[in-house]
């Protein structure tokens, strides 16, 4: 019984991404949006046990990766995530394995969700200004860092900003980082103390 239940759980995890990718394909077909399903292989050496499926869509003649399964893994009731909406190859393959079957090259990032929504920032000063607004309005801060590589040094600098601005209002910063995609989510809650940092794994369901 235990082994059967384990196999069922593994099948559920494996089939979830394929089902979601096929659902996106059906929805895009209904909306007249060109869309295909992309599939990557497992990689046991990295602890990735199963194949993974997502979508490639076409917007204004350009191709983009779309992975609703990864975004669903990261999303919570208070913050829906769009980290994997309209990514270029150089972005998606930071945390995706190579595709098994060839798909169109995705070289453009103009329609990346956070860029279109003006939530892709390039300077610490801009992050500080937006952090002040989020703390003042008691809102979640969710953004993409585009000011060069998100290194440990850059993250430390940003954490100082979150902590300083949160402490002004007697709050504490809870930070979640999608490191491969350089997306940062910050929640501000009442209470003093050091900020808490969580490194997210959008592919945790397949490991």
Language model features with spans:
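Generic structural signal for beta-strand residues in well-ordered domains
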Residues: 2-4, 48, 134
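Short beta-strand element of the conserved SAM-dependent methyltransferase core
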Residues: 13, 55-57, 186-188
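N-terminal accessory/pre-domain segments preceding catalytic cores
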Residues: 88-207
């Amino acid at each position: 019984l235990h082994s059967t239940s384990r196999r069922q759980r593994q099948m559920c995890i494996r089939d979830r991404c394929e089902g979601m990718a096929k659902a996106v394909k059906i929805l895009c077909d209904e909306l007249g949006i060109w869309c295909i399903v992309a599939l990557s292989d497992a990689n046991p050496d990295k602890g990735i046990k199963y194949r993974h499926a997502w979508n490639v869509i076409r917007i204004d003649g350009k191709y983009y990766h779309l992975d609703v399964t990864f975004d669903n893994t990261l999303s919570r009731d208070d913050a829906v995530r769009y980290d994997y909406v309209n990514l270029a190859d150089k972005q998606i393959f930071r945390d995706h394995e190579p595709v098994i079957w060839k798909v169109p090259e995705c070289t453009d990032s103009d329609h990346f969700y956070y860029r279109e929504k003006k939530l892709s920032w390039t300077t610490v000063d801009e992050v500080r200004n937006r952090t002040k607004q989020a703390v003042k309005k008691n809102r979640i801060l969710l953004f993409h860092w585009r000011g060069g590589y998100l290194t440990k040094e850059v993250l430390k600098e940003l954490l100082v900003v979150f902590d300083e601005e949160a402490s002004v209002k007697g709050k504490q910063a809870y930070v979640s980082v999608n490191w491969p995609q350089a997306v940062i989510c910050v929640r501000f809650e009442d209470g003093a103390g050091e900020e808490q940092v969580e490194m997210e794994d959008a592919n945790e369901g397949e490991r």
